[in-house]
A protein has these predicted regions:
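Active-site-proximal specificity loops/subdomain of glycosyltransferases
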Residues: 2-44, 48-49
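Short, surface-exposed basic-aromatic patches at helix termini and helix-loop junctions that form
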Residues: 2-6, 38-39, 60-67, 154-155
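Short, solvent-exposed loop/turn segments at secondary-structure junctions
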Residues: 17-18, 53-55, 119, 165-168
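Conserved glycosyltransferase catalytic-site signature
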Residues: 23-31, 53, 141-149
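Amphipathic alpha-helical segments that form well-ordered structural scaffolds
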Residues: 32, 118-121, 147-154
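A structural signal for short, well-ordered beta-strand segments and their strand-loop junctions
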Residues: 45-50, 57, 68, 113, ...
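Conserved catalytic core of nucleotide-sugar-dependent glycosyltransferases
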Residues: 54-136, 141, 145
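C-terminal catalytic/acceptor-binding lobe
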Residues: 127-175
Length: 175
C-alpha cells in the first residue's frame, strides 16, 4: 500500500497493529516498521511520524545537514521524579540500564529520526533480549519516548529530533 505525495511514496507497514496511547504498543509499531524497512529497503534515515507532525518546508536530502543529534543522557540518579520515570523505571529495559550502569535518554517520538546503523543496533539489541522486547511492547507507559533513544545512546549511535514535539523545536524551521 502506498500514499502518493508529490510523486514520491510513503510506504506503509502491511500488517496493521492496534496501538494504544501511553502504551508500549506504540514502540512495537515503530519496531515493526523499522524491521520491515531494514529487511526491504536501503535507506539513510528512518523517521518516526505521527498525525502530530508538521513540516514547515519540504524535507529532502539537502536538509539532512540540519539534523541535530539529541545528546540527552542521564544516569538513574540524575533523573527527576517528574515525567513518566516512576512507571518506566520498573520496566525490564530500565532494569537492564540500571543493572549495567548505562544511560537513559528521551525525546518526543514525533519526528525522532534514526540513521541506518542506529536501526540495526536497536533491532539487534531487542532481538537478542526477547524478555526486554516483550515487556517493552506490553508496558503501560509511553515507552516510545525513551526506549529506542536509550538504546542508541548506549550503543554510541546518534538519533535526531526533527519533529515538533516537546522541546524539540530548536531546528524545526530549518526543515
Amino acid at each position: 500500500r502506498y500514499i502518493k505525495n508529490n510523486n514520491s511514496y510513503i510506504i506503509l507497514y502491511p500488517d496493521y497493529l492496534n496501538k494504544k496511547r501511553f502504551h508500549g504498543s506504540l514502540t512495537e509499531g515503530i519496531y515493526r516498521n523499522m524491521q520491515y524497512a531494514l529487511d526491504n529497503y536501503n535507506y539513510k534515515y528512518f523517521i518516526v511520524l505521527s498525525s502530530r507532525n508538521i513540516f514547515y518546508t519540504e524535507l529532502n536530502p539537502e536538509k539532512y545537514k540540519y539534523f541535530i543529534k539529541n545528546s540527552f543522557k542521564k544516569r538513574l540518579n540524575e533523573l527527576s521524579e517528574k515525567w513518566h520515570w516512576p512507571s518506566i523505571l520498573r520496566s525490564e529495559i530500565s532494569k537492564y540500564i540500571i543493572r549495567n550502569n548505562l544511560y537513559f535518554s528521551k525525546s518526543a517520538h514525533e519526528g525522532v529520526t534514526f540513521d541506518y546503523n542506529a536501526c540495526k543496533d536497536i533491532l539487534s539489541f531487542l532481538n537478542r533480549n526477547d524478555y526486554i522486547r516483550k515487556n517493552l511492547f506490553e508496558w503501560n507507559s509511553c515507552m516510545e519516548e525513551f526506549a529506542l533513544q536509550s538504546i542508541c545512546i548506549n550503543h554510541s549511535q546518534p538519533y535526531y529530533d526533527i519533529g515538533n514535539g516537546t522541546n524539540t523545536n530548536y531546528n524545526i524551521n530549518d526543515l
